[in-house]
Curated annotation (Swiss-Prot):
SUPFAM superfamilies in the record: alpha/beta knot
Subcellular location as annotated: Cytoplasm
This protein's name: Ribosomal RNA large subunit methyltransferase H
Chain's gene name: rlmH
Classification via HAMAP family: 23SrRNA_methyltr_H (MF_00658)
Location (main, coarse): cytoplasm
Pfam families: SPOUT_MTase (PF02590)
Length: 165
């Protein structure tokens, strides 16, 4: 399975970019033993359309053009579900991998959010809590959760889980 993060906007040099790169590199290294062939990042330039509706529609077309037909898609959106623990995310990724899905695409929208066509294509819509977060930080959180999910699947001690369980 190939992992692909599709994000609107380009991260400037700084701590968010460094953390995103670190988690992506860790996912690639750990994923090799789990059937993960790559963890790629594609940055789509922010639309320059004047109206918000036009911007998110243009960005949606660019996002969906990168999503393979048989891909599993997780959209990161503030209107998504925030009740999925990391173990459940790992279970879903493992199930998609075991079902032969070629790619897992994580989508991070821009400042205007995600168009309904992207939300409709998603297998799951994930929120990182009720707060609105900068999309650069969401990208880091998405990559950290991918890495954490892989550590759970591998039985790696990075994720210690609930000590009471």
């Amino acid at each position: 399975m190939r992992l692909l993060v599709v994000a609107i906007g380009r991260l400037k040099n700084g701590p968010e970019r460094d953390l995103a790169a670190r988690y992506r590199e860790r996912a690639v290294a750990l994923g090799k033993g789990l059937g993960v062939t790559a963890c790629d990042l594609t940055e789509i330039p922010e639309s320059r359309a004047r109206r918000s509706a036009d911007r998110i529609a243009e960005e949606a077309a660019a996002i969906l053009a990168l999503v393979p037909a048989d891909a599993a898609v997780i959209a990161c959106d503030e209107r998504g579900r925030s009740d999925w623990p990391s173990e459940r995310i790992a279970d879903k990724i493992g199930a998609w991998r075991d079902a032969g899905r070629s790619t897992l695409v994580l989508v991070v929208g821009g400042a205007d959010g995600l168009h309904e066509t992207v939300r409709g294509r998603a297998d799951h819509i994930l929120a990182f809590g009720a707060a609105t977060l900068p999309h650069g930080l969401v990208r880091v959180l998405a990559l950290e959760q991918v890495y954490r999910a892989l550590t759970i699947l591998a039985g790696h001690p990075y994720h210690r889980g609930d000590p009471e369980a």
